Every structure is written in C-alpha cells, then in structure tokens.
Curated annotation (Swiss-Prot):
Main location class: cytoplasm
Name the UniProt record assigns to this protein: UDP-N-acetylmuramoylalanine--D-glutamate ligase
GO-annotated biological processes: cell division; cell wall organization; peptidoglycan biosynthetic process; regulation of cell shape
Organism name: Streptococcus pneumoniae serotype 4 (strain ATCC BAA-334 / TIGR4)
Positions contributing to ATP binding: 119-125
Length: 450
C-alpha cells in the first residue's frame, strides 16, 4: 500500500456503511484522517458501527442529520448506493465539499496496476474470467470492487506484483476524480438504473468516467456490437481495443465458431465453460485484456474452458431426475434475461420471472420468450410480465415467492427440461438483493432433491 498524507489530520465524513463504507472508514483512519461515520441504521442493529466505535472512530447512526455538515469537513466519502440527490450530498456539494466513492481511495493507495471493468451486463463474469486468466498466467489477479470485496480493502494488501481486477458500477464511477486504470473494459451500455441517474445519457456519462484519466498508453476495451461504443471511440484519449461477435475487428472477435485476437485463433467458442452468446462476448473481452497483458493462448483456453461461471450468473445449481436448475438471479433487466435465454432451447425451458416494478413494459422480451414451455411469474411486475407472456402465447402460473416459484416450476418440468430463474427485474420488492433471491432458489432446489 502506498503511504499517502493528503488525508492526514483532515476531517472526513463517511456517509453510509455497508462493506465499502466500513472499509473506507478504516483506511482513512489508518491514513491519519479525523473520521466521522454517519449511517442510517440504528446503532443497536449496526455491528459495523459498533466495531468502528470500539476502534475510536466517531459514529453517528439512526439518521442523516443535515446539521452534521455544519462542521468543516474537507471530504465526504459516500456509499455508492446513496444517490446524489440525497440531501446530505446536495448540502455537501453546495458547500464545496468534494464527494468521492471508496474506489477513488483504492486507486490512490494501490501499488498494483488496475484493470477496471464496467458495463450494464456481464461485469461480474468478465471480471472473474479476467482475474482467473491473469492468476493462471502468474500475474495474480485480485478481484475487488462491486464484486463483493471492497476495493480499498484489497488495495491495502496488493503489491506491485499483483493486478487489481476491479468491477465498477455506475454508482461507484460517479465518485471518481483521479482514478486511472491501465486497462478499462466496458462490456456493454444499456438503459439501466435510470431511476438513479435520471436519464440514459447521465448513466452513460457515469460509466464513461472510467476512462477520464486514461492516455494513449492505456487500453480501453469496447464492445463493437454496439454502435454507441463505436461512437464513443472518438471521445477518449485511450487506445481503443474492440471486441465483437458480429464483425472482424482489430481486437478480439468471433468468426466461424472460433475466437480470434488480431487474426490469431485463441480457442473455439464451444470450448467456453459456460453457455450463452453473452458469455462469448464476456470471453472475447477477457481475451482482449489477456493478450494486452501478454498471456499465452494455451493459458487463456485452459482457463476459460474450465470456467464454471459465477454464483447467481447463469449458475448451474443441480440436476433432479433429468431437470436442470440454473440460477440467474443477477439478471435484473431485460437484456440480461434475453442473453440467458439465448443459451437454451426455449421449448425445454420453464422460466421464473418478475420482481420489482419499475414501470417497464416487457414487449422487448416477447420474441425471446416465445416458444417457452411455461413461465412462473411473481413479484410487483407480475401484471406487466403476464402481458408479455400473453403476447408471446406462453402459458404461465403465478407464485407468491421464490420458493413457491421454484416448486411450481419443477412440477411443470419433465426430464430433459431446464428450470431457469432469470427474473428480468430487480429483487427489492421482496428481497434485500439478488443474492438473497438466488440463495433462496438454491435452497429450494436442495429441498426438492431430498
């Protein structure tokens, strides 16, 4: 870890705990800052706040009092999930207090080079693929960021012999200033999180922050399946390395079932260890990064062939009497579910879908669900999903929760079928996050097997 003194004796407010806030508070304290933590959860239900207080860090819980900002803070580090229209953040910005996310702290202290991965879908799988390929090549890829390991925590233990492979959300990237990866990947850009950002253009602008400090010596890996990505190439100083499944590009591409990098075959598409056209895109992005880091083709091929996927991302759960169960709880938008379905024969799929109602209609999903064996529909968005099923001519049943949906899907399936949880919706109408939803699916499958 680089020892920096820019925060020494500076008053810093950490707004919101969870993993990233707790990690940021500890790091800032270690760097000599005068830290105050403010979290909305009551103290008695807040183990993180209790632990920080025991370590001598000032903690204010149970709400976000605006008068707290009457103190002269030099900096605010916010939890990425807290939107910028939060009154505390608005007041801080009005007072001229810089507002960062914990990712910026990670960059400032990291001795390791950084590879940053963002995008609407495929971030976690691509991040994991890259980490595994680099580690197999002896470059020790350390996963961090939105993948569940706080970036500032991992950066503290990383040396210059490691590589920080960092998954980055749009929420995190809104709060960076000096952040400078040597390689950045944008997997794709689709209209998501509009409720947070206000518009698609603002969402894209947040993602685009990943390359703000990059130079011609750095590499920006972009998905040339999208015209938007092509249009953005003129707006960066970085050297663009494209990938595509639709055309031959000066980077990584699919041609005649083979994955190439700049004219050289790396492996066959059907050798990738996880199904789906979206995973071909993820593998191509990984190949581009790996080749930029001088990884040999055999290591790439062996690692991606053995890749078993990521929990909650088209994760194979079990096989019960010839019925295969896949957990794709991370599919919180329509595009992710479309890509999940592309890896299967619809006539053998019982799809579990529905969740938080964000006002979306699901007409885009109609061609993708046409021909499904059955659907099991649940959640706030059930009426909208049912309308799409009716348009597609797919029979469905309704369920009260994930456990009920899983049991009903199994009843509808026969030997050779697939039960696929790919909700096309966020989980927050019923569950704290997609992980909880996916874990309940896994638990119910285990019960069905008993």
């Amino acid at each position: 870890m680089k020892v920096i003194d820019q925060f020494k004796n500076k008053k810093v407010l950490v707004l919101g705990l969870a993993k990233s806030g707790e990690s940021a508070a500890r790091l800032l304290d270690k760097l000599g800052a005068i830290v105050t933590v403010n979290d909305g959860k009551p103290f008695e239900d807040n183990p993180a706040a209790q632990s920080l207080l025991e370590e001598g860090i000032k903690v204010i819980t149970g709400g976000h009092p605006l008068e707290l900002l009457d103190e002269e803070f030099a900096l605010m580090v916010k939890n990425p999930g807290i939107p910028y229209n939060n009154p505390m953040i608005e007041k801080a910005l009005a007072k001229g207090i810089p507002v960062l996310t914990e990712v910026e702290l990670a960059y400032l202290i990291s001795e390791a080079p950084i590879i940053g991965i963002t995008g609407s879908n495929g971030k976690t799988t691509t991040t994991t693929m890259i980490g595994e390929v680099l580690t197999a090549a002896g470059q020790h890829g350390l996963l961090s960021g939105n993948i569940g390991y706080p970036a500032s925590q991992v950066a503290q233990i990383a040396s210059d012999k490691d590589t920080l492979v960092m998954e980055l959300s749009s929420f995190q990237l809104m709060g960076v200033q000096e952040f400078h990866p040597e390689i950045a990947v944008i997997t794709n850009l689709m209209p998501t999180h509009i409720d947070y950002h206000g518009s698609f253009s603002e969402y894209v602008a947040a993602k685009w922050n990943i390359q703000n400090k990059m130079t011609a010596a750095d590499f920006l890996v972009l998905n040339f399946n999208q015209d938007l990505a092509k249009d953005l190439t003129s707006k960066t100083e970085a050297t663009v390395v494209p990938f595509s499944t639709l055309e031959k590009v000066d980077g990584a591409y699919l041609e005649d079932g083979q994955l190439y990098f700049r004219g050289e075959v790396v492996m066959a598409a059907n050798e990738i260890g996880v199904p789906g056209s979206h995973n071909v895109e993820n593998a191509l992005a990984t190949i581009a990064v790996a080749k930029l880091r001088d990884v040999d083709n055999q290591t790439i091929k062996e690692t991606l062939s053995a890749f078993g996927g990521v929990k909650h991302r088209l994760q194979f759960v079990d096989d019960i009497k010839g019925v295969k169960f896949y957990n794709d709880s991370k599919s919180t938008n329509i595009l992710a579910t479309q890509k999940a379905l592309s890896g299967f024969d619809n006539s053998k799929v019982v799809l579990i879908a529905g969740g938080l109602d964000r006002g979306n209609e699901f007409d885009e999903l109609v061609p993708d669900i046409t021909g499904l064996k059955k659907m099991v529909i649940l959640g706030q968005s059930a009426e909208r999903v049912k309308r799409a099923a009716d348009k597609a001519g797919v029979a469905y049943v309704e369920a009260t929760d994930i456990a009920d949906a899983t049991r009903k899907a199994y009843e509808l399936a026969t030997q050779g079928d697939v039960v696929l949880l790919s909700p096309a919706n966020a989980s927050w109408d019923m569950y704290a996050n997609f992980e909880v939803r996916g874990d309940l699916f896994i638990d119910t499958v285990a019960e069905l097997k008993e």
